């Protein structure tokens, strides 16, 4: 790999410490000297077509933001290096950087495609299309009443229920908000979409996993109270009553570079379920 870029969150205080260490190790191990550093907030406005690899330095939030802002024709894989708190989406921890770069040079790694969502919504009488890597959530405001939801799958009515909200999730996002609301873990290499209710008061809506090419239409009614559309837990948009939100698979996937010893179930145990100690030493 000749051209490697690094995306950083400019609001984090590591620009002169961890960043310099990462650049030095890349230069020494990968024999790459011209390393571009990018502001993760400006990714959408940059020409990254020459990159062979984009390293995202930060936590899950930084990687989610970069994934949404990348243009659909971006072809290079992403290597997430976790220096945040959780790092479920990251390929490696910062402490494993040197070993990871050596594996990169010996091609002991593989590109995994992660499905993304496209959310179409009417904002101020203008149709907007927004990408999501984890999930699209529609929920009531802080002091609002319950929301009445109508959910259609491929133009067929699936459910009508009243509750606090609902989550439409990718397999990658199944370990995030969807999991907190009672949704299942879904292996991230699959291409399916899950719908999970949030505090379903009527108990008439059950979580469902749909095929990846399904089109989901959501109508949210709240009698004039606040309704919010939230993308990956980072972008919030206040919706009008009776808003229609359409969610489907994005045509382009995110390419994540993972090493061959990557263990999805270990990530779940250690970073989501926090029961790594109970599983230590257990073998088949």
From Swiss-Prot:
Membrane-crossing segments per the record: none
Enzyme class: transferase
Keyword set includes Flavoprotein: no
Residue numbers annotated as active site: 60
SUPFAM superfamilies: NAD kinase/diacylglycerol kinase-like (SSF111331)
Alphabetic keyword roster: ATP-binding, Cytoplasm, Kinase, NAD, NADP, Nucleotide-binding, Transferase
GO cellular component, one term: cytoplasm
UniProt cross-references to Pfam families, sorted A to Z: NAD_kinase, NAD_kinase_C
Record field: catalytic activity: NAD(+) + ATP = ADP + NADP(+) + H(+)
Annotated protein name in UniProt: NAD kinase
